[in-house]
Curated annotation (Swiss-Prot):
The keyword Transport does not apply. It is an enzyme of class 1 (oxidoreductase). HAMAP family: K_H_efflux_KefG. It holds the Pfam family Flavodoxin_2. This is Glutathione-regulated potassium-efflux system ancillary protein KefG. GO terms for biological process: positive regulation of potassium ion transmembrane transport; potassium ion transport. Keywords: Cell inner membrane, Cell membrane, Membrane, NAD, Oxidoreductase. Belongs to the NAD(P)H dehydrogenase (quinone) family. KefG subfamily. Its EC number is 1.6.5.2.
Length: 183
């Protein structure tokens, strides 16, 4: 049996200690040898990102997972800074910027509202696909394959068994993250 591809899980939550849902979701990833869990807020509490280190991590992995809560229709501030600084022209995009070409991007996102809030006419006025479009466009700019996001709606209000079910599905996906086995 072949080895699974190396997965870099970029975890960005400024209040991780208070996020039961994200702690439950991280558990299976932390048990897999081919998955590197990289907590951005733990590594960069001062927001001074080591760009070269981060780019080297990206080079070493085939699947990049961005796990974070949905903050104001986007991601937490440190992840936004990371995206702007690390995915620079000449590295991930623009002339000669093909370091991530052919790699896979998956967003794993927790929300504070129920699924029905993310639809045309719902509380947030737009479907979640529209809200996540900037991430999809960033993946395209980096010549990466966009994988369907995993969403845990109303995360803080989910029953423990529902969170465990999401964590199990996440762990199963992490064991074989490439669509069609990578073919």
């Amino acid at each position: 049996m072949s080895q699974p591809p190396k997965v870099l899980l970029l975890y960005a939550h400024p209040e991780s200690q208070d996020s039961v849902a994200n702690r439950v979701l991280l558990r299976p990833a932390q048990q897999l040898e081919h998955v590197t869990v990289h907590d951005l807020y733990a590594h960069y509490p001062d927001f001074f990102i080591d760009i070269h280190h981060e780019q080297q991590l990206l080079r070493e992995h085939q699947v990049i997972v961005f796990q974070h809560p949905l903050y104001t229709y986007s991601c937490p501030a440190l992840l936004k800074e990371w995206l702007d600084r690390v995915l620079s022209r000449g590295f991930a995009s623009g002339m000669g910027g093909n370091a991530l070409a052919g790699k896979y991007w998956r967003s794993v996102i927790t929300t504070g509202e129920p699924e029905g809030a993310y639809r045309t006419g719902g509380y947030n006025r737009y479907p979640i696909e529209d809200i996540l479009r900037p991430f999809e466009l960033t993946a395209a700019m980096c010549h990466m394959h966009w994988l369907t996001p995993m969403l845990v709606y109303w995360a803080r209000r989910q029953k423990p068994e529902v969170l465990e079910s999401h964590a199990t599905a996440y762990g199963d996906w992490l064991r074989n993250p490439l669509p069609h086995g990578g073919r």
